[in-house]
Every structure is written in structure tokens, then in C-alpha cells.
From Swiss-Prot:
Segments for region (Flexible linker): 139-143
Localization annotation: Cytoplasm
Keywords recorded for this protein, A-Z: Cytoplasm, DNA damage, DNA recombination, DNA repair, DNA-binding
Record region (Domain III): 144-194
Protein name, entry field: Holliday junction branch migration complex subunit RuvA
Region (Domain II): 62-139
Length: 194
């Protein structure tokens, strides 16, 4: 088992990076391989998964990200690809707040997570994620958004804005009343690009 790999990023592809560690190339599946730059020296914190026909390495920028991945793997019905997709969603604080406040509906916005799996995540992880975020209480307003606003916030994160930036404008967008997803995105872009 490997705790971390330090080396030079040689390959960046959809879903993984190739890291050269002293002449040995490791393929490491990551939530967002495009966070890395080719030919940069970096450290990737890894989790090795052994299956009947495959040994895979999953890598993360921080130890906290890897620990969250490990917690998600303990949920019945969540495999490495689903856990990676959840982390790739970039909304760690929203995920933690939804679990800690018992709001499975919010979790269905992550790829591959339906109602049943979302309920299982809340059931299995509630009370076990407090060490990942100290600011859970202020996140409650995030959980009371309309589906349109939730979709718009997720789209803004997908466009490259950080979850922190998007969560900061959430109250302003929510105060606008009921709008379409497109309208929320347009208003959000204006607020974020000021």
C-alpha cells in the first residue's frame, strides 16, 4: 500500500494522471486530473484498491480529500468511481452539511447518486464527518435552496469557481426569489465576476 507518491506529472488524461516516481510511471485516478500541470513536481496522497482482476491507485491533493474518499467507500453501494465522482463535484462543504443535517435530497445532485444511495450515505456517515469541516452550521441555508438554485450553484462550480466563492453568493441568489436555473447562473456570473 502506498501513502503518497512524489514525482513529476508526465500524463494528464480524462480521469487520471501519470506520475513518474524515479523512473516508474504510476497511473493514478484523480477527481480532477486537470488540477495538475504536466512536468510539475507534485505529491499525490493515494489510496490503493485491490479487486479480483485489478489493482488501482486513487490520488488526491490533500490528506483530507483522501480521508473523505475512504469514508465514502464505507457506504454500502458506493464504489471507488462513485466516491471519486462525488469528490470531483467540488462541493465538500455542501456534502458534509447535507450528511450532518440529514438532507439526502441535496446529495442527489452528485453524479450517480439516486435517492436510495443518498439516504444510505446520510445513514452511514451522519456524525462521522464533523472533523472534515468546522463550519457546518452556516451551511444550513445551502440545504434549503430550490432545485433550480442548487443546479445553478453546481453549474458555477463546474465552470471553475470554487465552492467557497459560490457559497458566498448563495444567500444573494436565494434572496432573488424563484428563478430559472439559467437566470440564477447569469446572476451568479455577474456577482462572481465583479
Amino acid at each position: 500500500m502506498y501513502d503518497f507518491l512524489t514525482g513529476i506529472i508526465k500524463t494528464i488524461a480524462a480521469g487520471y494522471v501519470g506520475i513518474d516516481v524515479n523512473g516508474i510511471g504510476f497511473r493514478v485516478f484523480t477527481p480532477n486530473p486537470y488540477e495538475y500541470n504536466q512536468n510539475d513536481q507534485t505529491t499525490i496522497f493515494t489510496e490503493q484498491i485491490v479487486r479480483d482482476n485489478q489493482i488501482s491507485l486513487y490520488g488526491f491533493k490533500t490528506v483530507k480529500e483522501r480521508n473523505l474518499f475512504q469514508k465514502l467507500l464505507n457506504v454500502s453501494g458506493i464504489g471507488p468511481k462513485s466516491a471519486l465522482a462525488i469528490i470531483a463535484g467540488g462541493d465538500r462543504d455542501g456534502l458534509i452539511a447535507a450528511v450532518e443535517n440529514g438532507k439526502p435530497k441535496y446529495l442527489t445532485k452528485f453524479p450517480g447518486i439516486g435517492n436510495k444511495t443518498a439516504q444510505q450515505i446520510v445513514l452511514d456517515l451522519k456524525g462521522k464527518l464533523g472533523d472534515f469541516s468546522k463550519n457546518i452550521a452556516p451551511m444550513k441555508n445551502l440545504l434549503e435552496n430550490s432545485a433550480e438554485l442548487d443546479d445553478a450553484l453546481a453549474a458555477l462550480v463546474a465552470l471553475g469557481f470554487s465552492s467557497k466563492e459560490v457559497n458566498k453568493i448563495n444567500p444573494k441568489l436565494a434572496s432573488l426569489g424563484e428563478l430559472t436555473t439559467d437566470a440564477y447562473i447569469q446572476k451568479g456570473l455577474k456577482l462572481l465576476t465583479k
